[in-house]
A protein has these predicted regions:
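Short, acidic Gly/Pro/Ser/Thr-rich loop/turn segments
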Residues: 134-135, 164, 207-210, 241, ...
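Conserved PLP-enzyme active-site core in the AAT-like
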Residues: 1-187, 192
Length: 277
């Protein structure tokens, strides 16, 4: 994506984007490759206004981990008469829930390690584009840097892709029910779920120390950074300095798996019990 930005160009990125993405973009901006504007993706007026001044717009929708959603169609419509390139990280939505190219985006990226592969055993990314010059840029980069997946990774990702619809339907149904229950629990300050996907973000009472206690107390839900696998995982996100300031200090990101929803809820409940009943 960075190769698509002209020298001294401008990049738009969500304030609460994935920390690895923000780190890379901010580092390149500090080195003078381009300038960067960080925007609130849920403020459509601000976002569309920023598009008019940008060379590349990087959109996560939903964002990781705050689960903010952007009006992707409005962004693509605003960029269409311009030379602005719209890049969408579609990891959380997957092609089954959102198809950015059909809405007018130029490039779509996926962390295929997550829902597409679905078993927490692959390190792989995917880039999809309908833009021929962009494709040629990516192909040159792939050839020169050796960014080619191994045979085993390709096999495992293909295996996972075959069951994506089944896994996503089950995990999504679990996530909807867990969100409903979390939202009514008195120990939860708020719970956010965009209505699709497998990830819930929430905060508990008493701040980040309480969040650490909760996530360390689970037995079924794995205390880990990864997401999108068949197993449920969670963590407090602001454990590292690299996490964006827009991410609340006590935010817990719960990636919901395909286990029985009652088993997941029972474990979440007993973990929340460390805060009292």
């Amino acid at each position: 994506m960075i190769d698509l930005v002209p020298r001294d160009g401008r990049v738009i990125v969500p304030r609460a984007a994935y920390s690895g993405t923000l780190q890379l973009i901010r580092e390149r901006a500090r080195r003078g490759f381009f300038t960067v504007d960080e925007v609130d993706v849920e403020n459509t007026v601000q976002l569309v206004g920023a598009v008019r001044e940008a060379d590349v717009v990087w959109i996560e929708t939903p964002t990781n981990p705050t689960l903010m959603t952007a009006d992707l169609e409005a962004v693509c419509r605003a960029s269409a008469p311009l030379d602005t390139i719209v890049v969408v990280d579609n990891t959380f939505a997957t092609p089954l829930r959102q198809r950015p190219l059909e809405l007018g985006a130029d490039v779509v990226v996926h962390s295929a390690s997550k829902l597409i592969s679905g078993h927490s055993d692959v390190l792989l990314g995917a880039v999809v584009t309908r833009d021929l010059p962009a494709r040629r840029t990516f192909e040159r980069r792939r050839t020169r840097l050796g960014a080619t997946p191994g045979v085993l990774e390709a096999f495992l990702a293909t295996r996972g892709l075959r069951t994506l619809h089944v896994r996503l339907d089950r995990a999504e149904a679990n996530a909807k029910e867990l969100h409903r229950r979390l939202a009514s629990d008195h120990r939860v300050v708020y719970a956010r779920y965009p209505g699709f996907g497998t990830v819930i973000s929430f905060e508990v009472v008493d701040g980040h120390e309480a969040a650490e206690k909760v996530t360390a107390s689970s037995e079924l839900v794995i205390h880990a950074t990864s997401l999108g696998g068949v197993e449920s995982t969670w963590e407090r996100r602001r454990r590292h300095d690299a996490e964006p300031d827009a991410v609340p200090d006590g935010l817990i990101r719960l990636s919901v798996g395909i286990e029985d929803v009652e088993d997941i809820w029972q474990d979440v409940q007993q973990a929340l019990d460390v805060l009292g009943r």
